[in-house]
């Protein structure tokens, strides 16, 4: 506990899985959801929950995962011998960062929210202060999941894997997500006592419940939203996670004052920022790094990434804004226009069939149809500068 009386938390994020079902050369946790690697979502959730002491457990040769987890620490799991073994791969970090609570999350479960993390920590810190808190959920099909068996008092008695469960236990609909909070003072001791006397010869984190109870500590369950605990192990599940993330982002946009005329056809990046009274037409895609001011209209079939759009601009239809596009107030970008690495001052019009790249365009300039800025001579890329109020005629290069 800190000097100010606030409880402390250390987080371990398990990210060493090979993800063989993804059939990809890329580590599973680096596959993006809403434009951000899955592990990046988990790390951001921890930050939102106020947890800054975190370590990602990765496999050998996963330097790219370490980069994605930065600035947080990483620990390497040499042999993949189960979830408890993975947590203990971070023993040095855990011991060096003693805390009231140890929370274990998964790098391939990107949709968990800070509110759920907060609820789990609150349950751990509320009398009778259980030694372990497990995040449970109630899926439509509980078939393959471990079951959470509760006692008459509502406490967690055991976690039973589906393959080991009796018919009565299989009838239980409350399932184990794998996410848990453990008493930080006893976590390493309990984890060290987990054995591997099972068919796979692995060390299961779920066994910590029985060990804690054997020491007289209670175990509790917090029930979460099934969407939040969706683990991504295949491309199909990646698509499911993307759909859930997009629904959240669409709702956030509309709740923030934007109008989406056909929400299901609009795709956002995790960091898209829209002002108030923005209107977005159908089939619009936002890549990472887009900032849109108030009262902007983005018409159908536009693609934006790495762009800034100031108040009152009109984009599209069928327009593309690439990284470095910076549009001033009231700028108009019409159909089949592409803007890249260009500053367009207020009132500029580029209405038809044009490419403006690596350019500075002065206020009020009008760029005629078919205009191309040709900046590259085969060796060097130069800057095109168009003055205020200029009129560039059609089919100009």
Question: Language-model features: where?
Answer:
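Conserved N-terminal catalytic core of the sugar/cofactor nucleotidyltransferase
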Residues: 1-10, 32, 36-122
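Conserved alpha/beta core of the MobA/IspD/sugar-nucleotide pyrophosphorylase nucleotidyltransferase superfamily
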Residues: 3, 7, 173-274
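A phosphate-binding catalytic loop at a beta-strand-loop-alpha-helix junction
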Residues: 10-22
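Short beta-strand/turn micro-motifs composed of small residues
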Residues: 15, 58, 106, 136-137
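Conserved catalytic-core motifs of eukaryotic protein kinase domains, centered on the activation segment
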Residues: 22-26, 377
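Short glycine-enriched, charge-decorated loop/helix-capping segments at active-site entrances
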Residues: 26-32, 76, 194-197
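Conserved core of the sugar-phosphate nucleotidyltransferase
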Residues: 63, 70, 112-199, 206, ...
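Structural signal for interior beta-strand "rungs" in well-ordered beta-sheet cores
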Residues: 259-397
């Amino acid at each position: 506990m800190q000097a100010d009386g606030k409880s402390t938390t250390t987080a371990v994020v398990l990210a060493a899985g090979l993800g063989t079902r993804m059939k990809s050369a890329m580590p599973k946790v680096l596959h993006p959801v809403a434009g951000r690697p899955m592990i990046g979502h988990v790390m951001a959730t921890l930050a939102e929950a106020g947890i800054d002491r975190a370590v990602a457990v990765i496999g050998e040769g996963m330097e790219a995962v370490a980069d994605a987890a930065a600035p947080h620490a990483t620990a390497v799991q040499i042999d993949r011998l189960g979830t408890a073994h993975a947590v203990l791969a971070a023993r040095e970090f855990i011991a060096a960062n003693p805390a009231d609570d140890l929370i274990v999350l998964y790098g391939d479960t990107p949709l968990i929210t800070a509110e759920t993390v907060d609820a789990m920590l609150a349950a751990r810190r509320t009398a009778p202060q259980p030694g372990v808190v497990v995040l449970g959920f109630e899926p439509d099909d509980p078939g393959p999941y471990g079951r959470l068996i509760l006692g008459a008092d509502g406490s967690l008695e055991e976690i039973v894997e589906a393959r080991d469960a009796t018919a009565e236990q299989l009838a239980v609909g409350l399932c184990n997500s794998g996410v848990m909070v453990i008493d930080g003072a006893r976590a390493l001791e309990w984890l060290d006592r987990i054995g591997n006397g099972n068919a796979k010869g692995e060390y299961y984190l779920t066994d910590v419940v029985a060990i804690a109870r054997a020491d007289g500590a209670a175990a509790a369950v917090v029930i979460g939203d099934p969407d939040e605990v969706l683990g991504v192990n295949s491309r199909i599940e990646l698509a499911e996670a993307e759909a859930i993330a997009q629904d959240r982002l669409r709702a956030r946009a509309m709740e923030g004052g934007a109008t989406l005329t056909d929400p299901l056809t609009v795709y956002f990046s995790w960091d898209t920022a829209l002002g108030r009274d923005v209107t977005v037409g159908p089939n619009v895609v936002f890549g990472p790094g887009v900032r849109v001011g108030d009262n902007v209209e983005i018409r159908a079939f536009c693609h934006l990434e790495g762009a800034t759009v100031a108040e009152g601009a009109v984009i599209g239809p069928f327009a593309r804004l690439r990284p470095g596009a910076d549009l001033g107030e009231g700028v108009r970008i019409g159909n089949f226009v592409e803007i890249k690495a260009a500053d367009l001052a207020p009132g500029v019009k580029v209405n038809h069939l044009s490419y403006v790249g690596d350019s500075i365009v002065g206020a009020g300039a009008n760029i005629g149809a078919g205009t191309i800025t040709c900046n590259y001579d085969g060796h060097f890329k130069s800057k095109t500068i168009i003055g205020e109020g200029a009129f560039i005629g059609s089919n100009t290069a």
